[in-house]
Amino acid sequence: MSFRTIEWRDDKVVMIDQTRLPGEEVYCEYADYKSVAEAIRGMVIRGAPAIGVAAAMGVALGAREIIADTYESFFRQMENVCDVMARTRPTAVNLFWAIERMKRVADENRDKPLDQLREILKTEAIRIEQEDLELCKAIGRHGAALIPEGATVLTHCNAGGLATAGYGTALGVIRAAHDAGKKIQVFADETRPWLQGARLTAWELMKDGIPVTLISDNMAGFFMKRGEIACCVVGADRIAANGDTANKIGTYSVAVLAKENNIPFYVAAPTTTLDLSLENGDQIPIEERHSREVTHLHGFPVAPEGIRVRNPAFDVTPARYISAIITEQGVVSGDYVTGLRGLVAP
């Protein structure tokens, strides 16, 4: 891939600024954990796996900022760093998974000198980034087998390299199918209100030379009914124990349309996106974002001033609409409760 979503470089976190794509390919450097938290909150970086990596690197930066004479003081301040990162975005479980992993590593190394502990945390954050890239490639390999030769694949939002450490989940499946020689093409929903499909997915696929057609969100049913879409592949921000899946707002609508038109609807996500502590999707917290994201487009008003707005960032697709969940460990379908639990069994 010709871009890097996020990396640790010279004791700084470097991210591509996704708010400025596709017009400008700009990389931003962050030297402190609070600025990383703000980048996550402001969607400079987004996508569940990517913000998990960003959170881990933010914690590592925070550990380097802490001034402490005792372990008690260090770990007290570390807890505050982790709390700041955890409050950035509530829906994507990878964020919390990464923070908990960093806290666990810190706790396991309490006997080390503080300078060594800081280096251990940096190494762990980089390891999380590297692992995510490998997970995505494995997801791609498993999912590519589900994509028919010559298929037109519909995807929603951006679950590509920009949403992960690289390669992508849903787009990882598409990339792997393309690399395997299947002559596929992609329909990308524009994905209002942030236009991740138009700005990010279309940009990624065009860079890779994968044929892509942009459609507005309300066109999906039209093309499904005409038989122009063979299957749908989306990513996920949190998957409950029964397979209910939170993903970008509008995913549920696409899944219902796919079911009505007998089109397979696949979810691609690493096992780090599973939250088996939640029985079903009703328990998944849904982030609501600022009304301006709906009323303005690139700073220009597109709605009357003072209009009431609702802006949930995610919705939950019930498991009954999902044909299969593609993970780095394999594909699960049917009995999600048993299948998903089997993926993470010790």
From Swiss-Prot:
Reaction(s) the record says it catalyses = 5-(methylsulfanyl)-alpha-D-ribose 1-phosphate = 5-(methylsulfanyl)-D-ribulose 1-phosphate
Q: Which organism is it from?
A: Geobacter sulfurreducens (strain ATCC 51573 / DSM 12127 / PCA)
Question: Per its UniProt record, what InterPro entries does this chain match?
Answer: IF-2B-related, IF-M1Pi, IF_2B-like_C, Initiation_fac_2B_a/b/d, M1Pi_N, NagB/RpiA_transferase-like
User: Can you tell which superkingdom this protein's organism belongs to?
Assistant: Bacteria
| Role summary | Catalyzes the interconversion of methylthioribose-1-phosphate (MTR-1-P) into methylthioribulose-1-phosphate (MTRu-1-P).
Active-site positions, per UniProt? 237
- A biological-process GO annotation: L-methionine salvage from methylthioadenosine
Query: Quick one: which pathway?
Result: Amino-acid biosynthesis; L-methionine biosynthesis via salvage pathway; L-methionine from S-methyl-5-thio-alpha-D-ribose 1-phosphate: step 1/6
Q: Which residues bind substrate?
A: 46-48, 89, 196, 247-248
Site note Transition state stabilizer, residues: 157
Gene3D superfamilies with a match to the protein in the record: translation initiation factor eif-2b, domain 1 (1.20.120.420), Translation initiation factor eif-2b, domain 2 (3.40.50.10470)
Q: What is this protein called?
A: Methylthioribose-1-phosphate isomerase
